[in-house]
């Protein structure tokens, strides 16, 4: 798989087999279940300009994930985040959704998240902030869908 060097990706995976990961053999892969300090330390001396995370963010809080992304930006490192957590899709520019090794959806984050029925069928749903903002449009409290909780909160208070 080829990735654009200027784009951060989230790959939402559902029931993929081991061969799926062979397409990343040319990339540096950071494995799963790492804690923040360990992950940060590893990235501070990272030699490559592209890193693949395989469920590496599972134990991280939202603020820790943002901190990791800031560190990656500072070092000019782009990422591919392989995950089953729909919330992580909001941290990248581009999302590819796989089900059993078959690509189901692909596009910029907002385009993919507009496919709520397909995502729910695959067991994902929508990120909380997206779902909340959609629900609030039904009550005419908001007039658009939000992809960032800070922006949603700011607009609600104004």
Predicted features and spans:
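Glycine-rich P-loop/Walker A and Walker A-like loops and their local beta1-loop-alpha1 context
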Residues: 1-4, 9-18
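Conserved H-loop
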Residues: 11, 76-82, 84-91
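ABC ATPase nucleotide-binding domains
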Residues: 40, 118-158
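Conserved P-loop NTPase "ATPase switch" module shared by AAA+ and STAND
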Residues: 47-60
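Helical segment within the ABC ATPase nucleotide-binding domain
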Residues: 62-75, 87
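H-loop (His-switch) and adjacent beta-strand-loop-beta switch element
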Residues: 93-108
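Short acidic-hydrophobic catalytic motif
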Residues: 110-113
């Amino acid at each position: 798989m080829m990735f654009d060097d200027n784009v951060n990706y989230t790959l939402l995976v559902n029931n993929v087999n081991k061969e799926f990961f062979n397409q990343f053999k040319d990339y540096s892969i950071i494995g799963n279940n790492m804690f923040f300090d360990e992950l940060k330390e590893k990235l501070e001396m990272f030699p490559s300009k592209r890193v693949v995370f395989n469920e590496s963010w599972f134990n991280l809080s939202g603020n820790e994930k943002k901190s990791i992304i800031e560190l990656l930006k500072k070092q000019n490192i782009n990422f591919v985040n392989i995950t089953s957590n729909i919330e992580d899709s909001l941290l990248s520019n581009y999302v590819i959704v796989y089900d059993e090794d078959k690509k189901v959806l692909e596009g910029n984050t907002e385009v993919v998240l507009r496919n709520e029925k397909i995502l729910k069928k695959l067991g994902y749903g929508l990120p909380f902030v997206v779902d909340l903002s959609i629900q609030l449009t039904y009550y005419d409290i908001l007039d658009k869908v939000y992809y960032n909780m800070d922006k949603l909160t700011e607009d609600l208070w104004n």
